[in-house]
Amino acid sequence: MPTIQQLIRTERSRLKAKTKSPALKSCPERRGVCTRVYTSTPKKPNSALRKVARVRLTSGFEVTAYIGGVGHNLQEHSVVLIRGGRVKDLPGVRYHIIRGTLDTAGVKDRRQSRSKYGAKTPKE
């Protein structure tokens, strides 16, 4: 424990908050190119085949990103936009691919939460 004199001499250093999405480099989104599109299995209590893609970003990072929604049109060399946000049951997946932008199509026949999946207003 420091003395008051030691604290006067040198102030306590603040702890720097570590970012949860370092590959974005303080940007809201980043563009990248898919290098591999595949499925992955989640952690213990859950069971599924989650769609993920390995993406090389313009910031120089290569990250694993989750493809949300039902069905997708992504393949190798597709250009995608990535946002932060992890997938709790997939270790190492800290990013999401934004649907409805660049080469990523929106989800078909989506009626609720359309803005999250890049779906246009359905025709009546």
Curated annotation (Swiss-Prot):
Keywords assigned by UniProt, alphabetized: Methylation, Ribonucleoprotein, Ribosomal protein, RNA-binding, rRNA-binding, tRNA-binding
Segments of this protein annotated with the region Disordered: 104-124
Domain of life: Bacteria
Sequence positions bearing 3-methylthioaspartic acid: D89
Gene Ontology CC: one annotated term: small ribosomal subunit
GO term, biological process aspect, one: translation
Stored InterPro entries: NA-bd_OB-fold (IPR012340), Ribosomal_uS12 (IPR006032), Ribosomal_uS12_bac (IPR005679)
Keyword Cell division: no
One GO MF term attached to the UniProt entry: structural constituent of ribosome
Xref: HAMAP family: Ribosomal_uS12_B
PANTHER family: 30S RIBOSOMAL PROTEIN S12 FAMILY MEMBER
Family note: Belongs to the universal ribosomal protein uS12 family.
Record's function text: With S4 and S5 plays an important role in translational accuracy. Interacts with and stabilizes bases of the 16S rRNA that are involved in tRNA selection in the A site and with the mRNA backbone. Located at the interface of the 30S and 50S subunits, it traverses the body of the 30S subunit contacting proteins on the other side and probably holding the rRNA structure together. The combined cluster of proteins S8, S12 and S17 appears to hold together the shoulder and platform of the 30S subunit.
Cited NCBIfam families: rpsL_bact (TIGR00981)
Oligomer status and interactors: Part of the 30S ribosomal subunit. Contacts proteins S8 and S17. May interact with IF1 in the 30S initiation complex.
This protein's name: Small ribosomal subunit protein uS12
Highest classification ranks of the organism: Bacteria, Bacillati, Cyanobacteriota, Cyanophyceae, Synechococcales
